[in-house]
Amino acid sequence: MLNQKLNPTPSEDLTIDVDLFYETDPCELKLDEMIEAEPEPEMIEGLPASDALTPADRYLELFEHVQSTKLFPDSKTFPDCAPKMDPLDILIRYRKVRRHRDFDLRRFVENHFWLPETLSSEYVSNPENSLKEHIDQLWPILTREPQDHIPWSSLLALPQSYIVPGGRFSETYYWDSYFTMLGLAESGREDLLKCMADNFAWMIENYGHIPNGNRTYYLSRSQPPVFALMVELFEEDGVRGARRYLDHLKMEYAFWMDGAESLALNQAYRHVVRMPDGSLLNRYWDDRDTPRDESWLEDVETAKHSGRPPNEVYRDLRAGAASGWDYSSRWLRDAGRLASIRTTQFIPIDLNAFLYKLESAIANISALKGERDTEALFRQKASDRRAAVNHYLWDDENGCYRDYDWRREEMALFSAASIVPLYVGMANHEQADRLANVVRSRLLTPGGIMATEYETGEQWDKPNGWAPLQWMAIQGFKRYGDDMLGDEIAHNWLKTVNHFYQEHHKLIEKYHISGGTPREGGGGEYPLQDGFGWTNGVVRRLIGLYGEP
């Protein structure tokens, strides 16, 4: 189970000192009930008894030793290693030999683990291939089969084939996959769409939610809930009928709304926040408050410089990863200082728009099945959420949606996340028109739209542009009749990706688009990744709509 712990042998030489100088934020002391507003969530039910341990829990002090000494340049490498024998035997062997004078940690790891495979060279195209041909030829390279799973690895077995993003990401990711699916549909790969539909439904059935990705260390959180959008895509492309997924949609909704009924005003539990007027809105959350397995050392270092209890920082870092925007000024109290992260204190506009879509989808499919009471219930939930979003997250003075800091009771930053309400049909036409003006003046560039207008060094900020944001902006504005802006973003983005492709013969995770010639996007915790799943998916779909750039 997720919370299972073993007692490691004490190890003075592996201790990491953390100097704590706790800061006091007066705004966070305003109400006594806020101090106890977040009871510890119960353990997630329904996880399989075997192979659900994270590498950190399974290898204990060996894991800390490897990560704290930075044995691998990328902290994700060791959690993705697969053991060559029973993990308990490996741990016992480690405890026997680790204090020997000639102990070699690297040799020990290489003798006992299979290292992750690197396939980066395969993402580079034949220069003679068109952009469309390059993407279509990448799908087999990015496909993983169920039989590739090794016992006791952190990789969670899935029943069907799936697409990975590429680079360091050798597993499937929840919200990435939706944007990848757009391209699969355009490429005529209904076979892979069906496989991925079955996989995500299977994860909901077995885990009660769709994890961040199919790794044990991702089970404690999800990602932006886009399964309702996937179901809509399956229906549109004739892959699977929407009716078969009604129960899965309800299960996902229950995961996101767990604990809502028992919340008092100004209280939060897991993903749900009860606002001062009694309305319910959601935030990102992770059930663990330890360093992320895949970014262990980075998280420990960030917590060191935060001036807050480490477990609070770890929770906010994990919640930031659950948002898909890891990381961004959206979650920071002090722009440019990751240690100031407060993800769990923000009500995100994109998350609540996606949940509005989920509520609407449940209502619509229930109507198709003749379940009138369920339809009425979820239409009301969607209506209530839209009203709450308009009350707390719509900035009428500036004509845009913004995240909301529920602790401080004030609006937070404006970002490209504000276009998600348009993508899911949550806004009215006046809001869409006003938002278009703000996006034009603050986010639009000759290369597409930037994630934010703030340059912080984080990857989900200026100057970077990301494929999913372009797609939702293009379709969102066109949905409300602003074809001119939608088309401009589409042409700008296709020009960006094609320019880079013509020079480097590959697609990448993100692009620097704030001015001048488009180039590789930077920032964040890891090097730029090639591949790249959702870039391929969005660009392939846009080529189908607009032709080759």
UniProtKB/Swiss-Prot annotation:
Quote the InterPro entries the UniProt record gives: 6-hairpin_glycosidase_sf, 6hp_glycosidase-like_sf, Cyt_trehalase, Glyco_hydro_37, Glyco_hydro_37_CS
Q: Where in the cell is it found?
A: Cytoplasm
Q: Would the keyword Hydrolase turn up in this protein's UniProt record? A: yes
The pathway that the record names for this protein is: Glycan degradation; trehalose degradation; D-glucose from alpha,alpha-trehalose: step 1/1
Q: Which residues form the active site?
A: D326 (proton donor/acceptor), E509 (proton donor/acceptor)
Chief location: cytoplasm
Residues given in the record as substrate binding sites:
R168, W175, D176, N212, R221, S222, Q223, R292, D293, E294, G324, E525
Which PROSITE patterns does this one have?
Answer: TREHALASE_1, TREHALASE_2
Disulphide linkage map: none
- What keywords does the record list, in alphabetical order? Cytoplasm, Glycosidase, Hydrolase
Q: Can you cite a GO biological process for this protein?
A: trehalose catabolic process
Does this UniProt record's set of keywords contain Repeat? no
- Hey, which family's this protein in? Belongs to the glycosyl hydrolase 37 family.
Q: Which HAMAP family match?
A: Cyt_trehalase
Q: How does it assemble?
A: Monomer.
Q: What does this protein do?
A: Hydrolyzes trehalose to glucose. Could be involved, in cells returning to low osmolarity conditions, in the utilization of the accumulated cytoplasmic trehalose, which was synthesized in response to high osmolarity.
Name of the molecule in the record: Cytoplasmic trehalase
What's the source species' lineage?
Answer: Bacteria, Pseudomonadati, Pseudomonadota, Gammaproteobacteria, Enterobacterales
Q: Which gene encodes it?
A: treF
